[in-house]
């Protein structure tokens, strides 16, 4: 419903939604985006009453090294620590692998190393986005099938972007490949 650390007003809105959801028995269905920031996002979300965090990690070597200026090994350590910190706070964790589509296309070894290193972590869903909308249905199906076959015990979601009007086709391809969940917007 929101990203952590945006503003005090945003935190108040998250708190109001979380309180409503808890009163209706839907507390575990309210998710918010958090960051790998040493617990700052987790504290912000916890104060707002959010019980499910979608942690944003880097799904490509380019984003890891270029944006974070971290080695893949260091980023993996940071992600694992953030996951465990969230669980220690009583939160359920999903992991959003930003730029996953480019990771699979240009640095699949990076994606596999991240998933190998987190396969035993307490993550409910691994979210695989086509962040820049670069996929076509053929690559989507191939990349998604690869992950399902390599990691049969993990739950994968596909998150399409519609830059080139392929979001529906790519989502169908992810489902055909065996992905367990999809993210959609209905207008």
Q: Where are the regions that the model predicts?
A:
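Glycine-rich, proline-tolerant flexible connector loops at the mouths of alpha/beta enzymes
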Residues: 1-21, 57-70, 98-103, 127-138, ...
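Active-site beta->alpha loop and helix N-cap motifs at the rims of alpha/beta catalytic domains
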Residues: 7, 24-94, 98-111
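Distinct, well-ordered alpha-helical segments
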Residues: 10-18, 41-46, 104-116, 136-148, ...
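Acidic (Asp/Glu)-rich catalytic clusters
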Residues: 15-25, 42-51, 83-90, 116-122, ...
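Short C-terminal domain-edge/linker segments immediately following a structured domain
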Residues: 63, 83-89, 124-128, 157-158, ...
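Conserved C-terminal portion of the radical SAM core fold
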Residues: 93, 112-130
């Amino acid at each position: 419903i929101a990203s952590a650390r945006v503003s005090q007003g945003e935190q108040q809105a998250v708190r109001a939604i979380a309180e409503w959801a808890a009163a209706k028995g839907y507390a575990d269905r309210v998710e918010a985006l958090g960051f790998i920031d040493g617990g700052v996002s987790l504290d912000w979300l916890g104060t707002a009453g959010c019980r499910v965090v979608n942690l944003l990690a880097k799904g490509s070597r380019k984003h890891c090294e270029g944006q974070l200026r971290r080695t893949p090994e260091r980023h993996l350590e940071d992600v694992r620590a953030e996951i465990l910190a969230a669980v220690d706070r009583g939160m359920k964790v999903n992991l959003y692998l930003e730029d996953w589509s480019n990771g699979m296309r240009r640095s699949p070894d990076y994606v596999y190393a991240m998933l190998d290193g987190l396969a035993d972590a307490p993550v409910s869903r691994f979210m695989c986005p086509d962040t820049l909308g670069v996929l076509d249905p053929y690559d989507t199906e191939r990349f998604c099938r690869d992950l399902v076959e390599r990691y049969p015990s993990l739950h994968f979601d596909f998150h399409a972007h519609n830059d080139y009007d392929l979001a529906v086709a790519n989502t169908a391809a992810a489902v055909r490949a065996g992905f367990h969940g999809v993210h959609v917007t209905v207008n």
